[in-house]
């Protein structure tokens, strides 16, 4: 294959003519398409950067809100726990007070029953004393018999 100088010059001239024709008819259109595409890419990159910044801001905001919600949740739980403990303490206190009232009432009732029993015993003792006196008056007794009756009376009364 032989390449001659006129062929090289003809090829260069053809290339230059082709370049001029392409430049004249299509270069502006191609440049416009490339520029349009370039501006679209730049806009998309800028939009992506803006969206990324916005997403980071929203993420930080959401994390802050989540943290606040957790803190509020802890506060609410602690508040209700405190209220529950107070209610528990009130219930226990009321139960102790009720138990103390019942114990006091039971003691008073026992004391009243004891007094009633003592009064009944005294009444019986008086009746026995009257009975002994009447028996004593019915018969004349000597000193030994009198002592035996008193001991008998005391043993019956339980004094």
Curated annotation (Swiss-Prot):
> Where is it located?
Cell membrane
Q: Which residues form the signal peptide?
A: none
Source taxon at top rank: Bacteria
Q: How does it sit in the membrane?
A: Single-pass membrane protein
Chain ranges passing through the membrane: 2-22
Q: Which GO terms describe its cellular component?
A: plasma membrane; proton-transporting ATP synthase complex
Q: Which NCBIfam families match?
A: ATP_synt_b (TIGR01144), PRK13461.1 (NF009992)
Q: What does this protein do?
A: F(1)F(0) ATP synthase produces ATP from ADP in the presence of a proton or sodium gradient. F-type ATPases consist of two structural domains, F(1) containing the extramembraneous catalytic core and F(0) containing the membrane proton channel, linked together by a central stalk and a peripheral stalk. During catalysis, ATP synthesis in the catalytic domain of F(1) is coupled via a rotary mechanism of the central stalk subunits to proton translocation.
Family, similarity comment: Belongs to the ATPase B chain family.
State the oligomer form and interacting partners. F-type ATPases have 2 components, F(1) - the catalytic core - and F(0) - the membrane proton channel. F(1) has five subunits: alpha(3), beta(3), gamma(1), delta(1), epsilon(1). F(0) has three main subunits: a(1), b(2) and c(10-14). The alpha and beta chains form an alternating ring which encloses part of the gamma chain. F(1) is attached to F(0) by a central stalk formed by the gamma and epsilon chains, while a peripheral stalk is formed by the delta and b chains.
Q: What's the protein here called?
A: ATP synthase subunit b
């Amino acid at each position: 294959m032989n390449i001659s100088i006129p062929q090289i010059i003809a090829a260069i001239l053809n290339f230059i003519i082709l370049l001029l024709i392409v430049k004249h008819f299509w270069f502006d259109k191609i440049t416009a398409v490339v520029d349009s595409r370039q501006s679209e890419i730049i806009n998309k990159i800028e939009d992506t950067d803006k969206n990324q910044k916005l997403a980071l801001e929203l993420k930080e905001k959401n994390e802050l809100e989540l943290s606040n919600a957790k803190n509020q949740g802890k506060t609410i739980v602690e508040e209700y726990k405190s209220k529950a403990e107070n209610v528990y303490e009130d219930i226990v206190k009321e139960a102790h007070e009720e138990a103390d009232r019942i114990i006091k009432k039971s003691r008073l009732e026992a004391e009243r029953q004891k007094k009633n029993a003592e009064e009944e015993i005294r009444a019986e003792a008086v009746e026995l004393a009257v009975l002994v006196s009447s028996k004593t008056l019915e018969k004349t007794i000597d000193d030994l018999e009198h002592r035996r009756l008193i001991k008998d009376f005391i043993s019956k009364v339980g004094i």
